[in-house]
Design a protein with these regions (language model features):
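Thiamine diphosphate
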Residues: 1-176, 181, 313, 330, ...
Length: 334
């Protein structure tokens, strides 16, 4: 029996491999964006694709995000599967008109006759000390746009598996890539890289009985660290990685709440108007009789991303998460 080596790989490498394998398997897959070809992308996630598949299939575009996504709409209507890279999270805002008015609506507009298999890759979140427009958490905008799937991996295996699923989907997918996890490493089997749960399914990363931390993307490692630290206080925390914000896995989340009776939602986006409000509402509506305390949120503050020297104070950290868990215990005890 042959043993397949499991070796450390970064999330960036897994994403590159996902696009390479998709392009090799399907000639209709085209990668496009600013500097994705010759440079290989700002984060080098498309490195080598232009050399391997040619500039016709890995194409450098002008610095015009609305034009990039508008071209992708035409390509998808023609029968291609464009994979669009928006260089940074806030750079995607000029393309909102295309995304909201056309990408998200085309299947409904044509009564299902014309799907748009577009994957929009967006590096997002903080953690790299980026200046204005280079760090943002914009997932709530996409969640509020019917017709879009919104996916964000937090592990190397999910980076590969979810991106392959997104590219193969006939629905448009906003694929949010946590910038600060690009260089995170994990053991990964390159010969069985698609062995992950499908889009729309959450995963319990750590089991527990005291409370549930509901999170996704860049906040998963922080929640795992907080769960380990909580053991010293006698708290046994469960951690649920959503992986997909749309579709949302109510079943897995509510099953966790039934076990723990308490929940904290953790994300980098703002508290007011952020994803945590929707998640807390869904938990309350579906699991109310299992809750022993109100659902709490630990989020970025309601301000634009601060300058690099203040960023660590803005992002949810272990101390803020443990404070929320302590409040849950106090609320439950009356």
């Amino acid at each position: 029996m042959t043993t397949v080596a499991v070796k450390p790989a970064t999330m960036a490498q897994a994403l590159t491999r996902a696009m390479r394998d998709a392009m090799a398997a399907d000639p209709t897959v085209h990668v496009m964006g600013e500097d994705v070809g010759t440079l290989g992308g700002v984060f080098r996630v498309t490195d080598g694709l232009a050399k391997e598949f040619g500039e016709d299939r890995c194409t450098d575009t002008p610095l015009a995000e609305a034009g990039i996504l508008g071209a992708a709409v035409g390509m998808a209507m023609y029968g291609l599967r464009p994979v669009v890279e928006m260089q940074f999270d806030a750079f995607a805002y000029p393309a909102f008109e295309q995304l909201v008015s056309h990408v998200s609506r085309m299947r409904n507009r044509t009564r299902g006759r014309m799907p748009l298999p577009i994957t929009v890759r967006i590096p997002y979140g903080g953690g790299i000390g980026g200046v204005e427009h280079h760090s943002d958490s914009s997932e709530a905008y996409y969640m509020a746009t019917p017709g879009l799937h919104v996916v964000t991996p937090a592990t190397v295996a999910d980076a590969y598996g979810l991106l392959r699923q997104a590219i193969a989907s006939d629905d448009p997918v906003v694929f949010l890539e946590p910038k600060r996890l690009y260089w995170s490493k994990d053991s990964w089997n390159p010969e069985q890289p698609t062995d992950v749960e499908p889009i729309g399914r959450a995963v319990v990363r750590r089991t527990g009985r005291s409370a549930t931390l509901i999170t996704y993307g860049p906040s998963l490692p922080v929640c795992m660290e907080a769960a380990e630290a909580a053991q010293a206080e006698g708290w046994d925390l469960e951690v649920v990685d959503l992986r997909s914000l749309v579709p949302f896995d109510d079943e897995t989340v509510c099953a966790s709440i039934r076990r723990t009776g308490r929940a904290v939602v953790v994300h980098e986006s703002t508290g007011f108007g952020g994803p945590g409000g929707e998640i807390a509402a869904r938990v309350t509506e579906r699991c109310f009789h299992h809750l022993e305390a109100p659902v709490l949120r630990v989020a970025g503050f309601d301000i634009p991303y601060p300058p690099p020297m203040l960023e660590r104070h803005h992002l949810p950290g272990v101390d803020r998460i443990l404070d929320a868990v302590a409040r849950l215990q106090w609320e439950a005890e009356g």
